[in-house]
Amino acid sequence: MTKTEFAGFIREHGPVILDGATGTNLMEAGMPIGVCPESWVLENPQVLLDLQRRYVEAGSHIVYASTFTGNRIKLEEYGLQERLEEINTQLVALSRQAVGDQALVAGDMTMTGQQLFPMGELLFEELVDVYKEQASVLAKAGVDLFVVETMMSLQECRAAVIAIREVCDLPIMVTLTYNEDGRTLFGTPPELSLIHISEPTRPY
């Protein structure tokens, strides 16, 4: 799907309805705390199939593939980093099976859980590569678009958007988490976030 096609999709459907609180619903369906969500879903595929079918029945136009923490850094916490391609590919296929042609499937990406230098040890270029690896697999798996969601760090958000744009030209949705003062955890207001995310560039 091109950006122009996505814009047409939005115009055609009016308010576009996304899916629901998948993590919460998975835990209510029996997913234990502390397990790798991506792996658990693949071991219990019917749970996600039923959930996402209910989303579509309720009116969702876009569902998120259950690839939320499917990046190398997060998967490494469970010793699953070498299965990154397999896990992400199968999860996209599972969502596609659930919704058919009744909804779009978004490749879902989020934070790695590590801080960027100088607050942490992870370099910006390394983070772009981490996201680029996942984005490449998701694009190859056939997602219709990407969502970079629940981000608290503008820099990490920029890295994800840069990575996706270097891999493909699919549409990208971005969501950040804001505190009651209207700023992210790192103090960034929405207006500044929009400026930096709209045209992100590598800091050469």
Predicted regions and their residues:
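N-terminal small/glycine-rich loop or linker at the start of catalytic domains
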Residues: 6-43, 68-75, 101-126, 170-183
